[in-house]
């Protein structure tokens, strides 16, 4: 197999959903694809509830390994996944694009965050399977 496909997870601020997707993509599917995330805007730090829950659930410390990035910091990617930002994401050249339609859990309780994390987990595994079947 040649190079692994590069997947970019995109949302507005690159502080919560796309960061979770990048972390879980690396954790669950790094053998199949490379994970990146970015936003149309950036924030000084990623969502602290997301950091706390991903550390509790998966042992991943996103505060140490990830930061909010803008779209122009991405390498060329093969697949673009938007999180459901309800904004028109700028055009990023890619071979495949899809929207996961996930509501932002920011400002909600841990139960809403956990539901979002589980949805992203399922979507990452589904994407991994689809990419494996294409290779």
Regions found by a protein language model. Give the residues of each.
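Short polar/charged helix/loop
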Residues: 2-135
